[in-house]
């Protein structure tokens, strides 16, 4: 098996090394990841300048681009054909609305766009101590997916509590929860007195009840959320069609 590993925390992040080492027991692992932290990069792709790649002493490839750049580069000619893409282990949660901004999830999505099964895996906690737990779970999921293919346009978004493996209460298939709107921006001033702005903290949980990814984590379970790349809202078709029929367009 040939496995591509990427992330958004950067090629030197602890999570990616632990993940790659664990997956190496299943086959050949190639690591292609950003040269620095690119958290929040979402699905951005670099189109206005070339990408530069550096191979590190440990064999990993460092790219001066986004997580999506890394996977796109790897799967469209930079590497030999690959069987599966695993993105992570992210240092922090990717729950609910987080997936809209997550470079970790985006790297997995790019793998799926390019025809491969893909998993995004994140650790939930403030000072991550148990990356090995997520790495072992990722390995088991890769084994399962090698024999049981996911439907097209589907990835798995996996969140793991920062706990020793023997304290994990199980795995739950979940839906995305939601957060309230983000907190206001934070305004500060640079040494020259000019205003600068920081994006505010994410909003608190709004929908975090049973069945959500938030709830699974709170109860000590691994959350596994199947995400679909087709974002069409099919249930709205009839209502929207009726609404549009009321609009008169004249030349």
Swiss-Prot record:
Keywords: Cytoplasm, Hydrolase, Metal-binding, Nucleotide-binding. Signal peptide: none annotated. GO terms for cellular component: cytoplasm. Binds 1 divalent metal cation per subunit. The keyword Ribonucleoprotein does not apply. It is found in: Cytoplasm. It catalyses: a ribonucleoside 5'-phosphate + H2O = a ribonucleoside + phosphate. It is an enzyme of class 3 (hydrolase). InterPro entries: SurE, SurE-like_Pase/nucleotidase, SurE-like_sf. SUPFAM superfamilies: SurE-like. Its cofactor is a divalent metal cation. Its EC number is 3.1.3.5. A divalent metal cation binds at residues 8-9, 39, 90. GO terms for molecular function: 3'-nucleotidase activity; 5'-nucleotidase activity; exopolyphosphatase activity; metal ion binding; nucleotide binding. Nucleotidase that shows phosphatase activity on nucleoside 5'-monophosphates. NCBIfam families: PRK00346.1-3, PRK00346.1-4, surE. Belongs to the SurE nucleotidase family. This is 5'-nucleotidase SurE.
């Amino acid at each position: 098996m040939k496995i591509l590993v990427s992330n958004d925390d950067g090629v030197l992040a602890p999570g990616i090394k632990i993940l790659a080492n664990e997956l190496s027991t299943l086959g050949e692992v190639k690591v292609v990841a950003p040269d620095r932290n690119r958290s929040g990069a979402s699905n951005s792709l670099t189109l206005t300048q070339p990408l530069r790649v550096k191979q590190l002493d440990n064999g990993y490839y460092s790219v001066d681009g986004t997580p999506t750049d890394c996977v796109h580069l790897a799967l469209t000619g930079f590497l030999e054909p690959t069987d599966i893409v695993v993105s992570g282990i992210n240092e922090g949660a990717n729950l609910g609305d987080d997936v809209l901004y997550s470079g970790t999830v985006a790297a997995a999505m790019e793998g799926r766009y390019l025809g491969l099964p893909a998993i995004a895996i994140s650790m939930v906690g403030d000072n991550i101590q148990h990356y090995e737990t997520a790495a072992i779970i990722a390995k088991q999921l890769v084994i399962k997916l090698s024999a049981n293919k996911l439907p097209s346009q589907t990835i798995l978004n996996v969140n793991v509590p920062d706990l020793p493996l023997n304290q994990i209460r199980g795995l739950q298939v979940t839906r995305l929860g939601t957060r309230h709107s983000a907190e206001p921006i934070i305004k500060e001033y640079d040494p020259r007195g000019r205003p600068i702005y920081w994006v505010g903290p994410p909003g608190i949980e709004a929908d975090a009840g049973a069945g959500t990814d938030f709830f699974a984590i709170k109860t000590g379970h691994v959350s596994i959320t199947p995400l679909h790349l087709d974002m069409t809202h099919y249930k709205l078709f009839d209502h929207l069609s009726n609404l549009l029929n009321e609009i008169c367009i004249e030349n």
